[in-house]
């Protein structure tokens, strides 16, 4: 595996296994607004384009449902208070990030999760290894637009040359392409090998240590 100078990571399904807390908040919001719950696998399929899109997919009828805004607001409020209930780093992630920092690499998170939750999770799990964490904000286009990744590079003070984006989804592959940087696709997240290949993955790893398996 080529060694880069800057490693920018997706959050959900890449650094953290967040699916059970996301599903719990989705279903709390659906129950609170009189709608049927979703299965864990359904929520897994809905994740990847930010929490508004997650709820749009979870709510029957999406944005056209008159209860959508209430369900969306309930989800956000519930998730802010329950995002740490079962969420944890995937095995090997903390060791990977520590080794990257030991080698003097720059490390950032860029997620489509809303900004407050992204910041909270980064502070809680990776206070000494992640330098910049950017989530969805109204003033900047979310992935797959390049804007949030470019903003992370600006805050780190680095150029695109020598940077790589690491994620578990088609959105991450497209984001890296739009930034003109390589993408490492991971198999421990929310999408499988065939799905990633169909969506253009060119470098796929099954364990975090493979990202630094060779100098």
Q: What is each stretch, according to the model?
A:
Residues 1-45, 56:
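Active-site neighborhood of HAD-like aspartate-dependent phosphohydrolases
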Residues 1-5, 41, 101, 115, ...:
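Asp-based, Mg2+/Mn2+-dependent phosphohydrolase catalytic module
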Residues 9-11, 75, 149:
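Conserved hydrophobic/aromatic "anchor" residues
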Residues 26, 93-123:
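Substrate-recognition element of Asp-dependent hydrolases with the DxDx(T/V) motif
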Residues 29-30, 50-64, 121, 152-153:
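Helix-loop "lid/cap" segments that line or gate small-molecule binding pockets
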Residues 46, 50, 88-92, 113, ...:
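Short beta->alpha linker loops
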Residues 56-95, 103:
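Metal-dependent phosphoesterase signature
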């Amino acid at each position: 595996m080529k060694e880069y100078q800057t490693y920018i990571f997706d959050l959900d399904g890449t650094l953290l296994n967040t699916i059970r807390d996301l599903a719990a908040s989705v279903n709390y919001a659906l129950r609170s607004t009189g709608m049927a719950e979703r299965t864990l696998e359904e929520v897994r399929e809905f994740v990847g384009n930010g929490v508004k899109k997650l709820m749009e997919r979870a709510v029957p009828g999406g944005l056209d449902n008159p209860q959508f805004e209430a369900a969306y607001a309930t989800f956000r409020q519930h998730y802010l208070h329950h995002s740490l209930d079962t969420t944890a780093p995937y095995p090997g992630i903390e060791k990977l990030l520590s080794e990257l920092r030991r080698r003097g690499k720059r490390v950032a998170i860029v997620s489509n999760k809303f900004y407050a939750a992204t910041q909270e999770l980064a502070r809680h799990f990776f206070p000494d290894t992640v330098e910049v964490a950017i989530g969805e904000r109204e003033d900047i286009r979310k992935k797959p637009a390049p804007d949030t990744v470019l903003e992370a590079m600006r805050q780190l003070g680095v150029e695109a040359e020598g940077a790589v984006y690491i994620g578990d989804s088609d959105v991450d592959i497209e984001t890296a392409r739009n930034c003109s940087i390589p993408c490492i696709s991971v198999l421990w997240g929310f999408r499988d090998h065939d799905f990633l290949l169909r969506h253009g993955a060119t470098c796929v790893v099954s364990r975090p240590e493979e990202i630094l398996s060779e100098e």
